[in-house]
């Protein structure tokens, strides 16, 4: 069964990613999104639009040994700050959300790509996404 975890903020992300990547039998996917408010609403419009497609892709295509680490990058002001550690981290260099990364690989989707079920399927199946996203 796919395991899903949610963390908020950069330090919590780093800690969770380090811990979860210790499981060598699991495939770790990190999904960066905007922060949700108390009502569960995300300030990021693209994140809201991608959510149902992403949920469907997890259900249909993710291996049962997958781990989905959802990371809330902060509120709109925090995300816009050029000093935000998610922007400055040399491993991430996040420029837009949502972004989905197959952890410890170059395989990733960002922005509108996270709304495309076919691209999500390819990512979870680890096929050559680069050829498709360059079109």
Q: How would you label these PLM feature ranges?
A:
Residues 6-32, 50, 85-90, 98-106, ...:
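A structural signal for the main folded, soluble domain(s) of proteins
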Residues 6-8, 58-83:
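Thiol-based oxidoreductase modules, predominantly thioredoxin-like and allied folds used
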Residues 90-135:
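Non-catalytic, surface beta->alpha helical segment in thiol-disulfide oxidoreductase systems
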Residues 29, 37, 53-56, 66-68, ...:
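A structure-centric feature marking long, well-folded core domains of fungal metabolic enzymes
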Residues 38-40, 78, 108-110:
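Short catalytic/ligand-binding loop motif for oxyanion handling, primarily in non-cytosolic enzymes
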């Amino acid at each position: 069964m796919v395991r899903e975890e949610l963390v908020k903020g950069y330090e919590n992300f780093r800690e969770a990613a380090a811990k979860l990547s210790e499981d060598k039998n699991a495939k770790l996917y990190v999904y960066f999104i905007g922060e949700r408010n108390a009502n569960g609403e995300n300030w990021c419009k693209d994140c809201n639009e991608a959510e149902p497609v992403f949920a469907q892709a997890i259900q249909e295509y993710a291996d049962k040994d997958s781990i989905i680490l959802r990371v809330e990058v902060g509120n709109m002001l925090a995300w816009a700050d050029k000093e935000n550690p998610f922007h400055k981290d040399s491993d991430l260099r996040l420029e837009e959300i949502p972004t989905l990364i197959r952890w410890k690989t170059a395989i990733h989707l960002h922005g509108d790509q996270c709304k495309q079920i076919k691209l999500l399927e390819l990512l979870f199946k680890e096929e050559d996404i680069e050829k498709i996203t360059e079109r």
